[in-house]
UniProtKB/Swiss-Prot annotation:
Protein name: Chitin synthase 2
Induction summary: The expression levels changes little with temperature change, regardless of whether the exposure to the higher temperature is for 3 h or 24 h.
Subcellular location per the Swiss-Prot or TrEMBL entry: Cell membrane
Membrane topology summary: Multi-pass membrane protein
Family annotation (CDD domains): Chitin_synth_C
Organism: Exophiala dermatitidis (Black yeast-like fungus)
Keyword Cytoplasm in annotation: no
Region of interest (Disordered), ranges: 1-45, 110-179
Enzymatic reactions: [(1->4)-N-acetyl-beta-D-glucosaminyl](n) + UDP-N-acetyl-alpha-D-glucosamine = [(1->4)-N-acetyl-beta-D-glucosaminyl](n+1) + UDP + H(+)
């Protein structure tokens, strides 16, 4: 740790480190080799003999740290005068005084503990202190940057004698929102290892509402720490940046590191997520009988908020962050010493809670549980994967957490869901990743009135009842949803050659420019790549688990265009990632998994390969089933001529709609043609109703035909292969859905969403698949390019290694700015009316006109050819025996395949329930 060298180096004493080397506990440097290990408590015990008269700092007090408190920086215009005022005349240089004008060596020996040095061993930031033979040189390095009244610094709100008359305002653009002009004063700040790090006092109005250290002491509640990162996330630790948790008198160990990634979410979505996180932390603090958690559990948890781009963050969300105390406007810098700032890092331990009244966000002071917040505001919009790089590579390396939890802004975790995820890792030492149940936010069931939301709710529920439990039973989950999942930090680390899960995961950030279409689409689902690489990590045996008791609620698209765009990325990413996993399944054999586990993985990947083939041929299979059912309705035993005519009409409209869907998908944005997509969804829904009627009608007719025979018996019904296959397929699908839902005690979606899902099934097969495969060239996440943010001031180094910064000083201004931030979300936001972009509107018009012309031309030509050649249904009068036989065989294969896959999923879900019951019994014996 680096300090300014203060006072005369000739100072000596009976317990001086120079006189008694055994008392020297400073961090090693080239001039001072590493000493034997000393227990941290001994460092505190040696305070008694020292001449320093300082109050003893507790573990939670921020002792000497490499940040500069902005309220203690002296006016550069009166620099010489203040130098004479504060520098004592005696050579003692303040020896024995209760401030920072003391020997930094002795202060270091008394308060700093070697095992928690934030700097690499052997990399001391300053040269060794001058020897006794060297003359004393009162250069600028000997002038203290900070001169507080105690070991913790002065109280920022009661310090008298601060003279602002000589301060000058910096002639720079006013930041937005504009603070009071007198708030902007120019101060000189010494860079720490070339990095700009500031301790900023929080507004007195905020401080008055929360417990904090009494003056003149300071703690994590009185100051917000700002760091201007000028490096890549992977270089954060190497550039000697650190975080507040490592700077306490006794550095805190992080058990749980939670990241909330956001883009431009409003204050309601952000507050919803943070309220859920706060409740989880409070839950863990209330577990008084736990071996790991308890009253002080919040000290083991750090909540990191990463915002993707300074120009993208919602101003009202930023105001909520300011209300929590973890953001202050006007502190950030554009450049430091000529280097562009890549991220603005704010740290604060908040005691302010949040609450929602409808859609209105309000603050709740004096929260029972403090929360350590880390807010990283990225300068540029670089997508979510870059936000995870800051979380894992930058902050994770400094804090070295045990478990990392990933949450998207807008996802609300259950009151104990984060704890339930953590418990899965605690019970299973080889659990490398876990996920919970993602629920659709239904607003007390009101959103179920939207068929699209109801369909997605059913899809999510069945995935959490059949798919996730099945995969968890085998030990490999194809995807841990990025909206709510957790990883063991050590399991993600790369090997000594830099190869591993994180290396593969972050590869997708920079490869789009020169990668092939296959690889680029694969990295649209980089979380799937991470899951596979984690399980197949060389010489390891990590597994993935599904935690049913951990839930996270999230919003889903409620309009067709947004839904299509979302599924385009999901389908393309999941399909190509599945191909990658199947092609690299051999990597599982280089792991340390048992032979039985590897065999289970092989069975699971075989199952996934079959599913992948069904997904590839889904559009063809659906058409064939449609053709067979409509053809069967045209026989004399069923509807006769009426059935034939209806079949021809539906087939024409089917092919025309399918063709139109291809045309729209290849050149039009769903946002530009919402009515066209809505019409297609309506047609496919009507078609599914028709097919459902056809299935039921044919089943009834088959039973009637068998009953009318003279030698009828109940067993003869099942001798009909077509009827038996249809019954088995329907029973294995729909009946097992009901049974599995009741086994998981979650059957309500079967009564509220089942019909909507059945009706919209053709939309999933045709519209979504066609749009996805027709846009495999689109490797974006559906967000536009980065908007340019307002330019911030820069911090350039002056002679002497100092920089000028704009800092807050006046209590009135701090309160005024704090009030202005609170007012931003104190009222309901005005209804946003998105004005269409003229360029996009014109482009949509041209593409829509092109699509309509091409569609009309192709349909008219198709009708002409069909009528002249008497094909495409006109020749369907008699069904040949061979054609009938082939159709029967094909239909039987499809129906029995569906039955087999459904039964396989049901078996896996039942096994998951058995294992879960056993785990609960184990947990009840050894509570954590």
């Amino acid at each position: 740790m680096a300090y300014n060298r203060l006072g005369s180096p000739q100072r000596d004493g009976p317990y001086s480190p120079s006189a008694q080397p055994q008392y020297d506990s400073r961090s090693p440097s080239p001039g001072r080799p590493l000493q034997p290990y000393i227990h941290p408590d001994e460092a505190y015990a040696r305070q008694q003999p020292l001449h320093l008269q300082m109050p003893t700092a507790s573990d939670d007090r921020l002792a000497m740290q490499p940040t500069y408190s902005v309220e203690n920086v002296h006016n550069p215009q009166a620099y010489g005068q203040q130098y004479g005022q504060h520098l004592p005349d005696s050579g003692d240089m303040g020896y024995g005084r209760n401030d920072y004008i003391v020997s930094p060596e002795e202060h270091h020996d008394a308060y700093y503990t070697q095992p928690y040095s934030p700097h690499p061993q052997g990399d001391y930031a300053l040269d060794p202190y001058p020897s006794h033979d060297e003359p004393y040189r009162p250069d600028t390095d000997n002038v203290p940057i900070l001169q507080p009244d105690s070991a913790y610094g002065p109280d920022p709100h009661t310090q008298p004698g601060m003279d602002y008359d000589d301060y000058q305002e910096e002639p720079r653009p006013t930041p937005s929102p504009a603070p009071i002009r007198r708030w902007k004063t120019v101060k000189e700040v010494q860079l720490f290892n070339g990095n700009l790090v500031l301790d900023c006092p929080v507004p007195p109005k905020l401080l008055a509402n929360v417990p904090h250290a009494k003056p003149p002491e300071r703690d994590e509640f009185t100051h917000m720490r700002y760091s201007a990162a000028t490096c890549d996330p992977s270089d954060f630790h190497n550039e000697r940046f650190t975080l507040r948790q490592r700077l306490f008198a006794k550095p805190r160990q992080t058990e749980l590191f939670i990241v909330v990634t956001m883009y431009n979410e409003d204050e309601f979505l952000f507050a919803r997520t943070m309220i859920g996180v706060f409740k989880n932390i409070e839950f863990m603090c209330n577990r008084s009988s736990s071996k790991t958690w308890g009253k002080e559990a919040w000290k083991k948890i750090v909540v990191c908020i990463v915002s993707d781009g300074r120009a993208k963050i919602n101003p009202r969300t930023r105001a909520v962050l300011a209300g929590l105390g973890v953001y202050q406007d006007g502190i950030a810098k554009q450049q430091v010493n000529g280097k562009d700032v890549t991220a603005h890092i704010y740290e604060y331990t908040t005691q302010v809670g949040l609450e929602l009244k409808g859609t209105q966000v309000s603050l709740k002071p004096r929260s029972a549980t403090p929360v350590q917040l880390l807010f990283c505001l990225k300068e540029k919009n670089q997508k979510k994967i870059n936000s995870h790089r800051w979380f894992f590579q930058a902050f994770g390396r400094v804090l070295d957490p045990n478990i990392c939890v990933l949450i998207d802004a807008g996802t609300k975790p259950g009151k104990d869901s984060i704890y339930q995820l953590w418990k899965a890792f605690d019970l299973e030492p080889m659990c490398g990743g876990a996920c919970g149940e993602i629920k659709v936010m239904l607003d007390h069931g009101k959103k179920l009135l939207n068929p699209l939301v109801a369909t997605q709710n059913f899809e999510y529920k069945m995935s959490n009842i059949l798919d996730k439990p099945l995969e968890s039973a085998f030990g490999f989950i194809s995807v841990l949803p990025g909206a709510f999942c957790a990883y063991r930090y050590v399991a993600l680390q790369n090997d000594k050659n830099g190869v591993g899960p994180l290396e593969k995961y972050f590869k997708g950030e920079t490869m789009h420019a020169d990668a092939g279409v296959f690889t680029a689409n694969m990295y649209l689902a980089e979380d799937r790549i991470l899951c596979f690489e984690l399980v197949s990590k060389r010489n390891c045996r990590w597994i993935l688990q599904y935690v049913k008791s951990a839930t996270g609620e999230t919003d889903v698209p409620d309009r067709i265009p947004e839904f299509v765009l979302q599924r385009r990325r999901w389908l393309n990413g999941s399909f190509f990632a599945a191909v990658y996993a199947v092609a690299h399944v051999y990597q599982l054999w280089r792991t340390d998994h048992s032979f039985l586990r590897k065999l289970m993985f092989l069975i699971e990947f075989t199952y996934q390969t079959i599913n992948m083939l069904f997904a590839w041929f889904a559009i063809g299979n659906f058409f064939l089933v449609f053709r067979l059912l409509t053809a069967s309705l045209g026989t004399k035993e069923t509807l006769g001529t009426a059935g034939t005519v209806l079949g021809v009409v539906f087939e024409f409209v089917y092919l025309g709609t399918l063709l139109y869907c291809f045309i729209l998908s290849m050149g039009n944005r769903p946002q530009g043609n919402p009515k066209s997509y809505m019409m297609m969804v309506i047609f496919w829904s009507v078609l599914m109703v028709w097919l459902t009627f056809a299935s039921i009608f044919l089943t009834v007719k088959s039973i009637e035909t068998e009953v009318q025979q003279k030698d009828f018996s109940f067993s003869t019904i099942f001798n009909n292969s077509t009827f038996f296959g249809l019954i088995v397929s329907l029973a294995s699908t729909y009946v097992l859905w009901f049974v599995a839902s009741f086994l998981f005690f979650d059957p309500w979606h079967m009564f509220t969403c089942f019909l909507q899902y059945i009706v919209l099934t053709p939309t999933y097969i045709n519209v979504l698949n066609i749009y996805a495969f027709c846009n495999t060239h689109d490797i974006t996440w559906g967000t536009k390019g980065d908007d340019k943010a307002e330019k911030l001031p820069s911090a350039n180094v002056k002679p002497g290694g100092k920089v000028d910064v704009l800092i807050p000083q006046d209590d009135g201004d701090l309160n005024a700015q704090y009030d202005s931030e609170l007012k931003k979300f104190a009222t309901k936001p005005p209804k946003e009316v998105k004005a269409p972009n003229p360029a996009d509107k014109q482009e949509d018009y041209y593409k829509s006109f092109r699509s309509n012309v091409v569609t009309a031309w192709m349909i008219t030509n198709f009708i002409l050819v069909a009528a002249v050649l008497n094909i495409a249904g006109f020749d369907r009068i008699n069904v040949h025996d061979t054609q009938q036989q082939n159709s029967t065989i094909y239909l039987a294969v499809i129906l029995w395949s569906v039955a087999g896959l459904s039964l396989f999923r049901f078996t896996g879900a039942c096994w998951f329930l058995v294992v879960r019951m056993v785990s609960l019994e184990i947990w009840s014996v050894c509570k954590v």
